[in-house]
Curated annotation (Swiss-Prot):
CDD domains in alphabetical order: F1-ATPase_delta (cd12152)
Task of the protein: Produces ATP from ADP in the presence of a proton gradient across the membrane.
Family to which this protein belongs: Belongs to the ATPase epsilon chain family.
Compartments where found: Cell inner membrane
A Pfam family annotated for this UniProt entry: ATP-synt_DE
Lineage per the UniProt record: Bacteria, Pseudomonadati, Pseudomonadota, Gammaproteobacteria, Thiotrichales
Protein's UniProt name: ATP synthase epsilon chain
PANTHER family linked: ATP SYNTHASE DELTA/EPSILON CHAIN, ATP SYNTHASE EPSILON CHAIN, CHLOROPLASTIC
UniProt-listed NCBIfam families: ATP_synt_epsi (TIGR01216), PRK00571.1-4 (NF001847)
Length: 144
């Protein structure tokens, strides 16, 4: 029998995913991490980006704006501020959010305004990247 792990993705809105998986990929603060069953314990902050949950030939993709990844030997838990299934992301809205954040950065008058605009820009860019990666994966598998 194949070894798998329990994966739970939870946001303030509720549980988005709960199930068994063979591998999880997430955007940690220091770069992408790949988690396999029996991984050493880990607690790390997540930055805006894609989370992929792989089980056999199936792959579920999510966007999170920030959160925490906790890894136990047989359980991976992602606690996200906001989590959205990648297929539910709206590219036009993400592009508009990116444009607004860029405008806000140009018009920022304080360090706080700049920091807020940078966060908004990072989230919008991460959403666009998640959409692009999902589209590319679907195209490669002939599902687009």
């Amino acid at each position: 029998m194949a070894v798998s792990m329990q994966v739970d993705i939870v946001s303030a809105e509720g549980s988005l995913f709960s199930g068994k998986a063979d591998m999880v990929f997430a955007q940690a603060a220091d770069g992408e991490v790949g988690i396999l069953p029996k991984h050493t314990q880990l607690l790390t902050q997540l930055k805006p980006g894609q989370v992929r949950v792989v089980s056999g030939d199936e792959e579920d993709s999510f966007f999170i704006n920030s959160g925490v990844l906790e890894v136990q030997p047989s359980v991976v838990t992602i606690l996200a501020d906001t989590a959205i299934r990648a297929e539910d992301l709206d590219q036009a809205a993400a592009e508009e959010a990116k444009r607004r954040a860029e405008d806000a950065m140009e018009q920022a008058k304080s360090d706080t305004d700049i920091a807020r605009a940078q966060i908004e820009l990072a989230e919008a860019v991460a959403q666009i990247q998640t959409i692009t990666k999902l589209r590319d994966r679907l195209h490669k598998t002939g599902l687009s």
